[in-house]
Structures are given as C-alpha cells and as structure tokens.
C-alpha cells in the first residue's frame, strides 16, 4: 500500500535524474505536476478514436541545450513526449511554446505508415514572458518514436 502511495505521489514530477541533467546543461525553466490534455483522433493498430480526450499529469523543462517533456502513460514516469535539441527542425511533430504552456501536435501517419490521424498534447502551465525571451526557439519540429504513440494511445506496443 505504501509503495502505491509513494509511486502515486511521484506521478507528474520530473524524474530526479532528468532534473539533474537539465541543471548540468543550464536549466532555463522546469514545471512538474502539470495538467496534460491529450486529444487523439485517428487509428493506431489496436485502437481507433474519433475524438478521444484524456487528462494526465506530466512535466516539462527547458535547458540551454534542449526541450524535454514527460508523459506518464500506464505508470511509466520516464516516457517522454519530446526530448530534443533546440535546433531540431525535421519530423512529423511540432512543439510550440507560448505563455500558456507547451503544445505538441503529432501527425501520426508521419510517425508510422500504419498510423493515421493526429495526437495533440497540451501541457497547461503558464510560462512567464522573461522565460520565453530566454528560449532559443518557441517552435520546432521533431521526430517521434512509434512506441511513444502506442503508449500515449493506451496500446501495448508490438515487438
């Protein structure tokens, strides 16, 4: 019982090792226990959704080297929706950072031809204007691994 409560209290926090990595890289901003709204419309082998909306708790952080966000699906607190350098500009996903938080939009067919539709993740956390000015970029494109899409859609990935 105590293990469950301890693990439950850790949901949404940035893992300590990730926080240490960001600090070593020159942390700009971190946010833990952030409300994340996932919009999923499309098909991933094992699930089809016309317009599914789910709420989660995650975290994100910015360092001088990269942007990273966690998406704890099915108890995996280390699952990352984004973890890439600021100069990344290729891939089926787009991250946008505004004063309202971090938004990620994924073109599922671009991740894997077996997928269709889109997935949007909205990390709702106010980001001060002075922090936005310090960021190397407020929009970028990046690659997404199919295993992330499976996990975020609630499907056990195929080996």
Predicted stretch roles:
Residues 1-60:
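Anionic N-terminal interaction surfaces
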Residues 2-10, 16-26, 73, 81, ...:
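Positively charged, low-complexity terminal tracts
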Residues 26, 37, 53, 68, ...:
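Generic intrinsically disordered, low-complexity segments enriched for polar/acidic and small residues
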Residues 39-118, 124-126:
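Phosphoinositide-binding peripheral membrane targeting modules
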Residues 119-159:
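Terminal and domain-flanking low-complexity segments
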């Amino acid at each position: 019982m105590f293990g469950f409560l301890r693990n439950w209290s850790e949901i949404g926090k940035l893992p300590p090792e990730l926080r240490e990595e960001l600090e070593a890289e020159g942390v700009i901003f971190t946010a833990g226990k952030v409300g994340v709204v996932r919009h999923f419309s499309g098909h991933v082998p094992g699930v089809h959704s016309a317009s599914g909306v789910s709420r989660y708790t995650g975290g994100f952080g910015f360092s001088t080297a990269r942007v990273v966000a966690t998406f704890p699906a099915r108890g995996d607190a280390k699952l990352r929706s984004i973890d890439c350098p600021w100069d990344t500009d290729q891939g089926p996903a787009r991250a946008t950072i505004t004063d309202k938080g971090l938004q990620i939009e994924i073109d599922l067919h671009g991740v894997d031809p077996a997928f269709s539709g889109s997935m949007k993740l909205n990390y709702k956390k106010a980001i001060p204007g002075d922090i936005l000015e310090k960021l190397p970029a407020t929009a970028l494109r990046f690659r997404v691994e199919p295993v992330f899409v499976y996990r975020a859609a609630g499907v056990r990935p195929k080996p």
